[in-house]
Curated annotation (Swiss-Prot):
This is GLIPR1-like protein 2. Gene3D superfamilies: CAP. Glycans are attached at N145. Keywords: Glycoprotein, Membrane, Transmembrane, Transmembrane helix. The chain crosses the membrane at residues 253-273. PANTHER family: CYSTEINE-RICH SECRETORY PROTEIN-RELATED (PTHR10334). Residues 57-191 form the SCP domain. Residues 300-332 have a biased composition (Acidic residues). It is found in: Membrane. Coiled coil: none annotated.
């Protein structure tokens, strides 16, 4: 017979095996994260330096269009547009956002939203690389004929220099695979109002010569302090975003306040009632004499039976007296 190992030795071996498996799982998870590009230091959509970089580059390229534009607007950042870009980027789909044409699904105010997308390896991504690649499409676009070279795409450039657009929001997302790239970066910018392909992107002429009322010329673009003011939509997020950020809007805050107030009111009422009626929840004690305590249950039952019998006899005597009185009245 083979000698069996002590149980303590077996238990330690199994415990070490379980620990080793856990370590291997953690290493595997770490490798997956590295492989998917999640460790890449891509900026968040509300990072100030990131915002200043892409907004500044948009305005720089818009202010140097050729031929010059008479009415191109100055661009400023919009948080709702950047949230929409982030939400669609999380899907890692290098295709047009299907929610852009649906009312208030891409912005709480604007109804016409434009979009530009760039995809490439994570290590190749920079804001300048992505946006200038859209600007390079101008080489395939003829402003005079309002046409694009056959088999070429000019839509990114047209949106980039669309005259009526003045709000922009961008986001970059790391994807395991997107647009034919592995370990990809998906960069999306949304614009409001969005551009179309129904006309030239702007009117040619002297810079800022046809700005609107109240506008001023800033870096060869039409700016307006009221129009360019930043609006922070605190409680708005794309309704189709998954997983959705946890947000408590004014109605949620009101309901929470109402519940807390109701709870406090109930506590106050209970305290007032208890202070005015201190014995309201106390049971009234039943006083039992020493003689009754000494009696057995059988004796108590017998006494109750005798009482009922006496009551029955009393009722019988009363009925006989009533019958005698009735007979005497009949005789009279």
């Amino acid at each position: 017979m083979k000698a069996s190992l002590p149980w303590s030795v077996v238990w330690r071996a199994q415990s070490n095996y379980v620990r080793l498996r856990r370590v291997l799982k953690l290493c595997e998870l770490w490798l997956l994260l590295v492989g998917s590009g999640l460790n890449a230091k891509l900026p968040l959509e509300e990072d100030v330096d990131f915002i200043n970089e892409y907004v500044g580059l948009h305005n720089e390229l818009r202010g140097t269009v050729f031929p010059p534009g008479v009415n191109l607007r100055f661009m400023t950042w919009d948080v709702a547009l950047s949230r929409t870009a982030r939400a669609w980027g999380k899907k890692c789909m290098y295709s047009r956002n299907t929610h852009l044409d649906k009312l208030h699904e891409s912005h709480p105010v604007f109804t016409e939203i434009g979009e530009n997308m760039w995809v490439g390896p994570v290590e190749d991504f920079t804001v300048t690389t992505a946006i200038r690649s859209w600007h390079e499409e101008r080489k395939s676009y003829s402003y005079l004929n309002d046409t694009c070279v056959e088999d070429q795409n000019c839509s990114h450039y047209i949106q980039l220099v669309w005259d009526s657009s003045y709000k922009v929001g961008c986001a970059v997302t790391s994807c395991a695979r997107a647009g034919g790239f592995t370990h990809a970066a998906l960069f999306i910018c949304n614009y409001a109002p969005g551009g179309t392909l129904t006309r030239r992107p702007y009117q040619a002429g002297q810079f800022c010569s046809r700005c609107g009322p109240g506008d001023q010329c800033t870096d060869y673009l039409c700016s307006n302090t009221v129009r360019d003011e930043a609006t922070y939509y605190q409680f708005w997020y794309p309704p189709w975003e998954k997983p959705r950020p946890v947000v408590c809007n004014p109605m949620c805050i009101f309901i929470l306040f109402l519940r807390v107030a109701s709870l406090l009111l109930c506590v106050i009422v209970v305290l007032i009632v208890q202070s005015r009626f201190p014995v309201i929840l106390m049971e009234t004690p039943t006083i039992i004499s020493a003689e009754e305590e000494g009696k057995t249950e059988v004796e108590i039952v017998m006494e109750e039976g005798e009482g009922e019998g006496e009551g029955g006899e009393g009722e019988g005597e009363g009925e006989e007296k009533e019958e005698e009185e009735m007979l005497e009245e009949d005789e009279q």
